[in-house]
Amino acid sequence: MAERIAGMKKARRCILTGSLCLVAVAIASGAQGRENPAEVISWNRCLGQRPGFYATSEAVRIADNVLLYQRNTGGWSKNVDMARVLSEQDKAKLRKAKSKKDSTLDNSATHTQIRYLAKVYYATRLERFRQALLRGIDYLLEAQYANGGWPQTYPGLRGYSKFITFNDGAMIGAMSVLRDIAEKKPTYAFADEVRRQKANNAVQKGIECILKCQIVVNGKKTAWCAQHDEKTFIPRKARSYELPSISGSESVGVVRFLMSIDNPSPEAIEAIQSAVAWFGRVKLTGIRQINKPDSSLESGYDKVIIKDATAPPVWARFYQIGTNKPIFCSRDGIPKATLAEISYERRTGYSWLGYYATSLLAKDYPAWQKKWAPEKDLLSK
């Protein structure tokens, strides 16, 4: 009997201890306004939450952060974790920084913030978020060139940031948001009719710009550079190691956007077919990129390319215009034919090869081709 009573007391202690632990975790997880509360999510995970999240106090807290980070231009700067908990001092600094001219589309900035605020507004109907959204939309519309392209940064048009930019999905990200607005997708129904019409016009002009930028070699259309001249549409150089070239990476996002057009024009169909054919011609087979351990090196490894007959196809980040040969480059701006020839710092600090077009060719194109170009399958054997 005594053993039974002791066992019951032990069980109650375990239940009580467990309950207290759960309460402690809940308090830590839900804490807001303290200097160092437990983080729930980071900014790069904010768009991937379940629908119910966007009505929570945590989602609203992050959305209020996004409002603080919004510049007077209506856009946002890049490389900032906008989900972190802000102190009052942080907030004061952000209010003083409102007039900065560093709004950009680089690294998914601005269009990502618009998408997040749209989700929170749709769930909460808090007017301050709608007003911020309208300013963000106006920023995208104002930043567009008359020829339909978008610069990387606006209004700070200088250096390569003034070029029409496909790098890191800049222009495609802006166009995707504006198309959702133009089509009055549920999350974007907050926009008025005037802005919807402007968004639609901007998207159509953007498509025309994309088609004009497609690189033609010996009369044959290929794909796109990561950035193009804002006046002549020719491929342009960005950073010292990002030379004028045909991009095996950025072109994938461009083609996917064109494929998403409902009832595409003959010109859009031709652009897609030409780009897909180019991807098929320039794929690299029989090689694999690996990280080779080497304790003598700064990062403890080196990136090397080995022969491997079983390796799936890969694509180079950059191809030389005219030869379709992969190019690699150090900060000296001198193109090299192999990864091994460039500096260790650039070799390990940048993406030069990848499975960029794998799913585009294996999944996206077959589905698109059956619907919009059933008589011409460029990938059929």
What role is predicted for each listed range?
Residues 82-105, 149-166, 231-243:
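A cross-kingdom feature marking solvent-exposed beta-strand/loop segments within repeated
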Residues 56, 60-111, 116:
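N-terminal carbohydrate-binding/catalytic regions of secreted carbohydrate-active enzymes
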Residues 33-62, 180-205, 231-238, 242, ...:
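Terminal, non-catalytic domain-edge segments
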Residues 1-12:
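N-terminal secretory signal peptides that target proteins for export/translocation
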Residues 17-26:
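Bacterial N-terminal signal peptides
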Residues 62-74, 132-149, 200-219, 271-288:
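Long, well-ordered core segments of solenoidal/helical folds
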Residues 25-35:
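Bacterial Sec-dependent signal peptides at the C-terminal "C-region" and cleavage site
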